[in-house]
Structure formats: C-alpha cells, structure tokens
A protein has these predicted regions:
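Conserved polymerase palm-domain catalytic core
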Residues: 1-5, 9, 41-203
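A short catalytic or substrate-binding loop motif that flags glycine-/basic-rich loops and adjacent residues
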Residues: 9-10, 22
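Conserved phosphate-binding loops in nucleotide/dinucleotide-binding enzymes
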Residues: 15-18
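Duplex nucleic acid-engaging cores and interfaces of nucleic-acid transaction enzymes
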Residues: 21-22, 26, 31, 59, ...
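Electropositive, glycine- and tryptophan-enriched low-complexity nucleic-acid-binding patches
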Residues: 27-45
Length: 203
C-alpha cells in the first residue's frame, strides 16, 4: 500500500493506506462477500458504513432518545481508532464468523502488507488502514463487541463508525457510563478514549 494523507475536519492530517489496483479489486470482492454474511449480525444501533443505513437515520434515532427524556449524552471518541485496532483480536473475531481459511489468510495479508512511504516500506503490526474497501467492514466487526456490551447494559446509544453517543437522564449517570465504558474499551478492545474529544454534555 501507498501512504496518503487528507485534512481532518478538526485539524491535522488523516493517514490513508491506499492499496494497489489489484489489491483494491481483491479487497472489494472479499468485502462484497463478507458484507452479506456479517452485516445482518451487527447491531441495529450501528449506522456507519452499512447498506441502507445513514447518518440521517442516526440523527433521527438520537432525537427520539432525547424526546424520551434522555437529554444528556456521553460522547465517546476512540483515539486513533483505525491506526490502533488490535489485529490479532480482529482476526480472532473474524475467525469466529468465517470458516474459510483462505479468506482469513487473505485478510491477514492485507493487514500485514506494510505501507510504502518515501520509498521505504513500514510494517503494519496494528490498525486497519483507512482507504481500502475492507476497512469499513472490519471496523464495524471490531466494534460490534462494544455494541453488544452497551446493549447488554441496557444503554440507549447510536454508533457511527468510531464515534459513539450514549443517551442518559443525568450528568451523574453520564459520568458513571463514561467511566465504565472507557474501562471496557481499554480492557476488551485494547483501545483508549480520546479524553480531549469525549465528554458528557446536555443534548
């Protein structure tokens, strides 16, 4: 893959891993097959990178929660999510749902391919590079454990890619949820919450 960068809305640069033409073709083919198998298993509260789901639907669901009196929101932003996905955990989750070892081997090769930057190849031991057709699907697979945990705890939430909003009745409840879910993300997903971009606030 080649390294590319685009400006981030909040400032700075977002790094992309741009696959070769052949790799993009192969990733697209694998993504189409896996999407049909994996997407029906994902949470109804997940809206990003999914067929027949949109940001407009996510906003409508959030407005419904607020109308029900859940007018405090725990706004979670996962720090450098795409760069820090634990590949072993991701491949383990994939192996639970995909039996074809050839597909698993191919995806492992995509993840471990390395990135070409300034004529040098850097290894990719963590993360799922943004810019490839498979990354959106793999990101939803990785964060499905978060969706399931939030559902198990009875939370009302909306997740769009790596941004997750949880709706609660009070700031005290929000702080409690922030602490508990941050610990879950660190312990089970091997990721961290971006404290500067995460907050409990009135909707």
């Amino acid at each position: 893959m080649k390294r590319g960068e685009i400006p981030k809305p909040g400032g700075g640069q977002r790094k992309l891993g741009i696959p070769t033409v052949l790799d993009r073709f192969l990733q697209q083919a694998v993504a189409q097959v896996l999407q049909k198998r994996l997407d029906p298993t994902f949470s109804e509260h997940s809206y990003g990178y999914r067929p027949h789901r949109s940001a407009h639907q996510a906003v409508a669901q959030a407005q419904q929660y607020v109308a029900q009196g859940l007018d405090w929101v725990v706004d979670l932003d996962i720090e450098k999510f795409f760069d820090r996905v634990n590949q072993d955990r991701l491949l383990g989750e994939l192996a639970k749902r995909v039996a074809d070892k050839r597909v698993l081997k191919l995806i492992r090769a995509f993840l471990k391919a390395g990135v070409l930057e300034d004529g040098l190849v850097s290894p990719t031991d963590e993360g799922t590079p943004q810019g490839g057709p498979l990354s959106p699907l793999l990101s939803n697979l990785y964060l499905d454990a978060l969706d399931q945990e939030l559902t198990k705890r009875g939370h009302r939430f909306v997740r769009y890619a790596d941004d997750c909003n949880i709706y609660v009745q009070s700031p005290r409840a929000g702080e409690r949820v922030m602490k508990g879910i941050s610990a879950f993300i660190a312990r089970h997903l091997k990721l961290r919450i971006n404290a500067a971009k995460s907050a409990v606030a009135r909707s």
